[in-house]
């Protein structure tokens, strides 16, 4: 598999990762181990990836792992096509824990909370990790493939 310039730079500096190739727009995708993510996030920020464009999470496969995905952009004045990278961090479904990058990119606040609420990934050291869309009393993680839909629905008055 062809590695991009960022992957080559990380290899040169002994940063452990795995290249996953490029997406349809030519954005390099890298896999980072959960235990290394907080320190590598700081390296990427210092290197110039100063904008967290988006963060999301998904269930990879029933009985498999969960993934937290970060789309980072290197914003610079006078540059029309900023550099982008996609980072994927995987966690086991039985104890899904990933370090929070709230302290690196503040925009991760609500995005990591939504991923926690919908998929159940716990983001370590997040200052306000609690449900954001579902009630605190909700049981389960609605976007997991093994989620069982409750057999009740609250009827709400639209008026």
Swiss-Prot record:
Task: Name the reaction it catalyses.
Answer: a plastoquinone + NADH + (n+1) H(+)(in) = a plastoquinol + NAD(+) + n H(+)(out); a plastoquinone + NADPH + (n+1) H(+)(in) = a plastoquinol + NADP(+) + n H(+)(out)
Q: Tell me where on the tree of life, at the top rank, the source sits.
A: Eukaryota
**Which named protein is this?**
NAD(P)H-quinone oxidoreductase subunit J, chloroplastic
Write down the species.
Zea mays (Maize)
The principal localisation class reads plastid
Q: Which GO terms describe its cellular component?
A: chloroplast thylakoid membrane
The cross-references to InterPro entries, in alphabetical order and at most eight, read: NADH_DH_suC, NADH_quin_OxRdtase_su_C/D-like, NADH_UbQ_OxRdtase_30kDa_su, NADH_UbQ_OxRdtase_CS
Report the EC number(s), separated by commas if there are several: 7.1.1.-
**Membrane topology according to the record:** Peripheral membrane protein
Q: What is this protein's function?
A: NDH shuttles electrons from NAD(P)H:plastoquinone, via FMN and iron-sulfur (Fe-S) centers, to quinones in the photosynthetic chain and possibly in a chloroplast respiratory chain. The immediate electron acceptor for the enzyme in this species is believed to be plastoquinone. Couples the redox reaction to proton translocation, and thus conserves the redox energy in a proton gradient.
Keywords tagged on the record: Chloroplast, Membrane, NAD, NADP, Plastid, Plastoquinone, Quinone, Thylakoid, Translocase, Transport
What's a GO biological-process term for it? photosynthesis, light reaction
Cell compartment(s), UniProt: Plastid, Chloroplast thylakoid membrane
Q: Which NCBIfam families match?
A: PRK12494.1
